[in-house]
Amino acid sequence: MAKKVDGGMRAKRLTGDIVTYIILASMCVIWLMPFFWVIMQSFRDGVGQYISTFLPQAYTLNNYKALFTDFSVINFPRMFMNTFFVACCSCVISTFFVLAVSYSLSRVKWKMRKPYMNMAMVITLFPGFMSMVAVYFILKALGMTEGDKIYLSLIICYSSGAGVGFHVMKGYMDTIPKALDEAAMIDGCTRWQIFTKITLPLCKPMIVYQVITSFMGPWMDFVFAKVIAGAKSQYWTVSIGLFNMLEKEYVEVWFVRFCAGAVLVSIPIAVLYLLTQKMYQEAMSGAVKG
């Protein structure tokens, strides 16, 4: 009797596992299908938005080549470098801001600490684009919406609010025993040495997370870049360029190039994720061993 019960339980468990894996596989296919379609369309030989078949009839690399040779509508290489420069600068500044604010809130007791945390919590409840118009007119009054100052304006917009996004990093720093800081201070270490030699190495997983999010924000943003850069195409980012490819007068010819551009734009994020994932795994394995 016990064997029959065990056999029935195993059969139910096996059936449940099969159903679970089928559902997960179906969801994976549904999720990956649009990405696969865009990649295939980027190699399609021809023009137009729609074709009668899911896969292209003929393949070519001309769509990728056109992005770097045909500047009649957009200058894709320049937009790519504009975005890369702004995203890298914003990433470095934002990560530094978050680390500094998180450390001061986690380890240093000061008078306005709790009011600042409460204020930051309220501010993060509102989307950033609500301040877009005010930010634009402030930058315009300062003369920072013309010429190369547009780069600085974009970097300021993307990194200036990083100081209020400290919650995840601070929560992680709170888990680090303060006894480590006290022992280091007894040995004669300064606050800066404790921060750089002890806290930062232990925060590697969260630093990786912060780097990824700080880079992806400027890389994928459209609203602030469009408002600040305006019609000055030499300062456009890739999001504006890709959007411009889908304008009514260009979409028939540039749709397949749009797909090629979308593939190229995803490469830096994929590379960053792969590199930081390795660092994250190494940091976590080191923490477990420690």
Q: Positions of the model-derived regions?
A:
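Short, Lys/Arg-rich, polar N-terminal cytosolic tail immediately upstream
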Residues: 1-11
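A structural signal for multi-pass alpha-helical bundles of membrane permease subunits
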Residues: 10-12, 16-290
